[in-house]
């Protein structure tokens, strides 16, 4: 399997255009980068980046997605080619999306995957903690998440299930900053998860990485021939890629671990953020490039998958899971099984 690479264009006023079978990046009429199109799975542009019309056509023809984000990483638009995939699969997805029992079963497993993987983050932290009080706090957090896992089968509807998920998230984020090195906690303290806009540095970093992960999950869903708008856990709303968000849940723990690593290694520091009027905190400058490089490197790390005989790069795991979900929608498998961290 080949890992589909994503090109991130972050330099303001860049111009990207088609040069035969190559994408060329220019800044002030100077060529900065050439990338053969067959090496690319997606192109993501931050802020004021110009894209030539011939390149747009070629990306659409070659099935390479073009994603436009604002300068702070918020999603703006996405260009895709013709819709691919089996229409019968999408019909099945739409029909099963209206089946309360089926939707609840898929949503429950998405939440179970998320909670279980987040619990593994806390358990690992507890084992590695040097301070007994911190190890105990992380162990209690892991125990709370284990209680949520035991309660999930009792959820009789999506609202109850979402309530369990919300409480688990609250317990998880309450313990998460304990995994930061002590010298970074004052700068990266958080009072739970907040967004739109993020109100502290760690939430700003989490939001940035979650945006990258969501784009990859949406690409995986679309590559499998599924409709990204029709989800099971996340309610259907205009403009929301509900199914991509469903798929993303089981991978959030990977994003969280990357964020913790960036802070603990000093790759991202307190001065890499700016506070805007109204209290919004945003990742700025070269730190975004640091995060993008680290994210791309993490995507190339090989992980085992219980259903495959060979290691899989993390960047391909959303594609594997999207295809497993498609098999469930076709009726080839009894239930959707999320990817679980070992």
Q: What label would you give each PLM region?
A:
Residues 39, 47-120:
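A surface-exposed, charged beta-strand/loop segment in the N-terminal or early-internal portion
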Residues 1-17, 28, 34, 88-342:
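Active-site helix-to-loop segments that bind/position phosphate- or nucleotide-bearing substrates
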Residues 43-45, 59, 75, 205, ...:
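Long, contiguous hydrophobic alpha-helical segments, chiefly transmembrane helices and signal peptides
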Residues 17-49:
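N-terminal ordered "arm"
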């Amino acid at each position: 399997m080949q890992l589909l690479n994503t090109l991130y264009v972050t330099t303001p006023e860049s111009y990207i255009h088609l040069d035969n079978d190559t994408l060329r990046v220019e800044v002030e009429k100077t060529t900065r980068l050439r990338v053969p199109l067959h090496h690319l799975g997606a192109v993501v542009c931050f802020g004021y980046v110009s894209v030539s019309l011939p390149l747009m056509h070629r990306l659409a023809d070659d099935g390479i997605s073009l994603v436009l984000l604002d300068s702070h990483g918020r999603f703006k638009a996405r260009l895709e080619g013709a819709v691919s995939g089996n229409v019968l699969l999408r019909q099945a997805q739409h029909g099963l999306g209206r089946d309360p029992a089926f939707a609840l079963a898929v949503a429950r497993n998405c939440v179970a995957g998320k909670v279980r993987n987040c619990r593994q983050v806390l358990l690992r932290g507890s084992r590695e903690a040097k301070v007994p009080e911190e190890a105990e706090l992380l162990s209690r957090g892991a125990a709370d998440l284990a209680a949520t896992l035991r309660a999930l089968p009792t959820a009789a509807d999506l609202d109850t299930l979402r309530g369990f998920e919300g409480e688990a998230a609250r317990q998880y984020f309450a313990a998460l900053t304990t995994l930061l090195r002590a010298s970074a906690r004052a700068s990266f303290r958080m009072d739970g998860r907040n967004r739109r806009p993020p109100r502290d540095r760690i939430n700003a970093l989490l939001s940035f990485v979650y945006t990258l992960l969501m784009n990859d999950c949406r690409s995986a869903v679309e590559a499998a021939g599924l409709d990204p708008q029709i989800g099971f856990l996340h309610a259907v709303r205009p403009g929301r890629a509900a199914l991509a968000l469903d798929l993303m849940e089981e991978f959030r723990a990977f994003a969280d671990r990357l964020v913790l690593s960036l802070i603990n290694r000093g790759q991202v520091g307190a001065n890499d953020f700016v506070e805007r009027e109204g209290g919004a905190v945003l990742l700025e400058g070269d730190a975004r490039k640091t995060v993008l490089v680290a994210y791309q490197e993490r995507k190339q790390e090989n992980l085992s998958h219980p259903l495959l005989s060979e290691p899989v790069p993390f960047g391909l795991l959303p594609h594997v899971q999207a295809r497993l979900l498609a098999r469930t929608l076709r009726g080839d498998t009894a239930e959707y099984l999320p990817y679980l961290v070992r």
